[in-house]
């Protein structure tokens, strides 16, 4: 879908194949993780081999007692490194572009957790054997797995285009039944505020589907065999 617009009976959806009309729309457009500077082919290879990972909540246990790096800085990057510290003693936080942007409190937290801090910029990322290597001003560093903590782009443009309320970070705001602020529009998954996990998104999708069915039935009874 390339465009979502309001219509007198609901919504007008434009796609590459043409236009559709719908009384209700469920947006499950998710987010796009910001990637480290590496070719798509290398990125996909590293991802398939577990050298590059994006969700420590999902698979942090798989890097137990290995040598792990987090690419990121600021409190966001540090929090991911601290989370991974629960799985392994060897965690390094590498700033992608320059010196670390950490507060005194952040530096203290990193020191207390024995997290190594490496300033960037990262000049190159390569795969060498079963390790992902980062070229930094401190030298070439090799890791069993690397987690980018570079943030994400929330794909909420379609919701914004019809006037749905968004959070300060751009997530679509919904009620307990996945309704947005615009009647007939629903949202589920990573595009709304919550835990970015498949199982959580599936649950929200189930809630949204039930809500949509019931809301449509309140407009007009849904009886089989009747137009």
PLM features: what roles do these ranges have?
Residues 1-66, 136, 145, 172-176, ...:
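FAD-binding core/adjacent interface of flavoenzyme oxidoreductases
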Residues 1-8, 12-14, 19-22, 86-171, ...:
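A Rossmann-like FAD-binding core segment of flavoenzymes
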Residues 78-80, 188-227:
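A conserved FAD-binding loop/helix module that cradles the flavin
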Residues 72-74:
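Glycine-rich Rossmann-fold phosphate-binding loop(s) that bind the pyrophosphate
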Residues 36-38, 64, 79-81, 103, ...:
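Short glycine-/acidic-enriched loop or helix-start segments at secondary-structure transitions
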Residues 66-67, 90:
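Residues that mark the start of a beta-strand
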Residues 43-62, 150-197, 207, 214:
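FAD-site-proximal beta/loop scaffold in flavoenzymes
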């Amino acid at each position: 879908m390339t465009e979502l617009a309001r219509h007198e009976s609901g919504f007008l959806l434009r796609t590459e194949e043409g236009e559709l009309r719908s009384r209700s729309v469920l947006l499950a457009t998710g987010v796009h993780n910001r990637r480290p500077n590496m070719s798509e082919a290398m990125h996909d290879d590293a991802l398939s081999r577990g050298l590059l990972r994006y969700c420590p909540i999902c698979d942090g246990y798989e890097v137990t007692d290995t040598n792990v790096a987090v690419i990121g800085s600021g409190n966001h990057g540090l929090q991911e490194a601290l989370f991974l510290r629960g799985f392994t003693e060897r965690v390094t936080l590498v700033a992608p572009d320059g010196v670390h942007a950490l507060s005194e409190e952040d530096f203290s937290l990193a020191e207390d957790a024995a997290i190594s801090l490496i300033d960037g910029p990262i000049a190159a990322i390569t795969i060498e054997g079963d390790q992902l290597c980062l070229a930094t001003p401190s030298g070439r560093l090799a890791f069993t797995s690397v987690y980018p903590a570079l943030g994400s782009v929330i794909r909420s443009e379609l919701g914004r285009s019809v006037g749905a309320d968004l959070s300060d970070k751009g997530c679509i705001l919904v009620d307990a039944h996945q309704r947005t602020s615009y009647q007939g529009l629903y949202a589920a998954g990573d595009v709304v505020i919550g835990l970015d996990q498949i199982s959580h998104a599936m649950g929200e999708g189930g809630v949204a589907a039930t809500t949509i069915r019931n809301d449509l039935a309140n407009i007009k009874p849904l009886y089989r065999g009747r137009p």
